[in-house]
Amino acid sequence: MSRRIRAQKRPVPPDPVYNSRLISMTIRRLMASGKKSLASRILYDALKIIEERTNQDPLEVFETAVRNVTPLVEVKARRVGGATYQVPMEVRSDRGIALALRWIIRFSRQRPGRSMVSKLANELIDAANETGAAIRKREETHRMAEANKAFAHYRY
């Protein structure tokens, strides 16, 4: 075991526009090279596009998208006697949300098109409607866990 003291988790302050911690977490994950103002502009513009297209509260659509993408189980590699098993594990809520945000942003970046604003908006709308690449990733993760259910007794 490491003797190093574990860093304290600092609370994420809510964002100033929607007063949501989830939005703030997304801005921080969207940010590249310390350009937080650019990341926040991209997300807020994407939320405006969502409002125009769906005629719904953009925060509600965003939260639904994140909830739909959040995985419940994942597999972790565990070595037992020279063999590596993919052991299904339940995902803690904070890790699940972090994975969901990471996947939404990653698959937004991979979408074809020019502006990140429209790509992010489209991915969020798709995720809220339970379609899109981020949802496929979650389904794939759940399938992997289901396929390796036999190794569940190796949990640690």
From Swiss-Prot:
InterPro entries reported for this sequence: Ribosomal_uS7 (IPR000235), Ribosomal_uS7_bac/org-type (IPR005717), Ribosomal_uS7_CS (IPR020606), Ribosomal_uS7_dom (IPR023798), Ribosomal_uS7_dom_sf (IPR036823)
Gene3D superfamilies: Ribosomal protein S7 domain
GO MF, one annotated term: rRNA binding
Pfam families: Ribosomal_S7 (PF00177)
Matching CDD domains: uS7_Chloroplast
Any single GO BP term: translation
Top-level lineage group: Bacteria
Keywords: Ribonucleoprotein, Ribosomal protein, RNA-binding, rRNA-binding, tRNA-binding
HAMAP family: Ribosomal_uS7_B
Family of this protein: Belongs to the universal ribosomal protein uS7 family.
PANTHER family in alphabetical order: RIBOSOMAL PROTEIN S7
Function: One of the primary rRNA binding proteins, it binds directly to 16S rRNA where it nucleates assembly of the head domain of the 30S subunit. Is located at the subunit interface close to the decoding center, probably blocks exit of the E-site tRNA.
Descriptive protein name: Small ribosomal subunit protein uS7
Organism, scientific name: Acaryochloris marina (strain MBIC 11017)
Name of the coding gene: rpsG
